[in-house]
């Protein structure tokens, strides 16, 4: 028995949930439909003249739009649940608009926040509706707000118009209002936030439907039977005007529709031109940035090649400056980048017998400047010690050390050169040494 009671309760809860969702769907559909009728009425009557607060059609449209923005809004009440049409909530749709529309360029949110005569959230929301219509940017505001899905879900319950596909339909309808000039005064009792909004459905319940739009045969037969029984000229399906008035009214309606479509066409063409100009500017900026990128890449490659060449040149110079450890002295002297010229000690002073035979060791060398010569002037004393070490036919050079190229600086002296400064007066970069048996000048202590 308890199980059956639980099942019954669950079935009732499920049915009530379905009924609630069905009611919400009906509310959504009704609000979108009446909003479409209201926008159509505004476009038909006020395309050629501005609209202000005295227009009943606008007052009704503002009430409908406020109801749509407040549909399933999470309003916080002091106690008890708040319905979607209640005016007892602590906050209104303005709190959502203030956050979701803050990213719109040149928006009116800050100006409405700074209004002194408007304090409540409802009054600010109504002021925003009027300012957005005067700016002809209502559709842009709503579209930007819908893109912020996180904020929208935070302010609206499931089933709200702002969370459904009907919101896209709403933005499409609001585009047509850009063809109307609105003029409002943001002062008065309509913006105090205390007066609840009421939608007047009576203008949209009066309609005339012709037989051409009837699709159900039974409905057509019932209409014919009711016409024959009542035989009353006030039947809604019978024409109440003459043919001339009918044609004139049709022509007037067609003219109004043409003006509306023409105004919307001009607005859309202007919008397309604006977007095309923006697209051209962006394409030009893109090309400019591409050229800058290509130039930067080419310059980078050139600098890279130059640096690689410098690295290779420095490696070659470093390889030439660092000889092998056990190479002969002559081979090491050949590897010098700046050879020593006329800096060898006199062979006669070292060994008289070997001086004449080895005097041909002098070669012709070239030097670039006098700096390498002057840099080794301080090594003359070491050269004298080398000369003393070669007496009695002993090999010249320090005993116990290898004659490696690192000791080349100890093999010569600048004492035989009259002056290092006189080298700058040489007309040629090459020095020719004769093969005469005369030895070099004796070493002079430094």
UniProtKB/Swiss-Prot annotation:
Compositionally biased region (Polar residues): 372-384
Gene Ontology CC entries for this record: intracellular membrane-bounded organelle
Xref: Pfam families: RUN (PF02759)
Coiled coil: 267-322
Phosphoserine modification, residue list: 232, 416, 419
The entry's keywords: Coiled coil, Phosphoprotein
Every RUN domain range: 52-189
SUPFAM superfamilies referenced in this protein's UniProt entry, alphabetically: RUN domain-like (SSF140741)
Taxonomic superkingdom: Eukaryota
Disordered: annotated segments: 216-239, 372-404
GO MF annotation, one: GTPase regulator activity
Residues with PTM Phosphothreonine: 215
Keyword Nucleotidyltransferase among record annotations: no
Renumbered residue ranges of the record's region Interaction with RAP2A: 1-298
GO BP: positive regulation of cGMP-mediated signaling; small GTPase-mediated signal transduction
Keyword Coiled coil included in the entry's annotation: yes
Described function: May act as an effector of RAP2A in neuronal cells.
Subunit-level organization: Interacts with the GTP-bound form of RAP2A.
Family: Belongs to the RUNDC3 family.
Entry protein name: RUN domain-containing protein 3A
Species of origin: Homo sapiens
Gene: RUNDC3A
């Amino acid at each position: 028995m308890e199980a059956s009671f639980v099942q019954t309760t669950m079935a009732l809860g499920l049915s009530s949930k379905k009924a609630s969702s069905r009611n919400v769907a009906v509310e959504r559909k009704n609000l979108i439909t009446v909003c479409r009728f209201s926008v159509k009425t505004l476009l038909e009557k006020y395309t050629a003249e501005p609209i202000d607060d005295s227009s009943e059609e606008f007052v009704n449209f503002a009430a409908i739009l406020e109801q749509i923005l407040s549909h399933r809004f999470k309003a916080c009440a002091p106690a008890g649940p708040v319905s979607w049409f209640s005016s007892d909530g602590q906050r209104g749709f303005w709190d959502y608009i203030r956050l979701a529309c803050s990213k719109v360029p040149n928006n009116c949110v800050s100006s409405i926040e700074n209004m002194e005569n408007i304090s409540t959230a409802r009054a600010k929301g109504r002021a925003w509706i009027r300012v957005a219509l005067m700016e002809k940017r209502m559709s842009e505001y709503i579209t930007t707000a819908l893109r912020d899905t996180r904020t929208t879900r935070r302010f609206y319950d499931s089933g709200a118009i702002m969370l459904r596909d009907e919101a896209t339909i709403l933005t499409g309808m609001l585009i047509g209002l850009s063809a109307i000039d609105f003029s409002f005064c943001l002062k008065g009792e309509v913006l105090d936030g205390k007066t609840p909004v009421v939608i007047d459905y009576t203008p949209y319940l009066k309609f005339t439907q012709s037989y051409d739009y009837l699709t159900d045969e039974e409905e057509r037969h019932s209409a014919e039977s009711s016409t024959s029984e009542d035989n009353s000229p006030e039947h809604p399906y019978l024409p109440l005007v003459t043919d001339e008035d009918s044609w004139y009214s049709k022509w007037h309606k067609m003219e109004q529709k043409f003006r509306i479509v023409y105004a919307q066409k001009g607005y859309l063409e202007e919008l397309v031109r604006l977007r095309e100009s923006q697209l051209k500017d962006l394409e030009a900026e893109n090309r400019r940035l591409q050229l800058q990128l290509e130039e930067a890449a080419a310059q980078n490659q050139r600098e890279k090649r130059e640096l690689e060449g410098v690295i290779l040149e420095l490696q070659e110079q470093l390889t030439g400056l660092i000889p092998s450890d056990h190479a002969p002295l002559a081979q090491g002297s050949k590897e010098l980048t700046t050879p020593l010229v006329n800096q060898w000690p006199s062979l006669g002073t070292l060994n008289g017998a070997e001086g004449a035979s080895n005097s041909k060791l002098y070669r012709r060398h070239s030097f670039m400047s006098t700096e390498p010569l002057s840099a080794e002037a301080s090594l003359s004393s070491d050269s004298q010690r080398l000369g003393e070490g070669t007496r009695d036919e002993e090999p010249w050079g320090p005993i116990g050390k290898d004659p490696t190229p690192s000791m080349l600086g100890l093999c010569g002296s600048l004492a035989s050169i009259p002056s290092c400064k006189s080298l700058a007066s040489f007309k040629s970069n090459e020095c020719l040494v004769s093969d005469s048996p005369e030895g070099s000048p004796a070493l002079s202590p430094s």
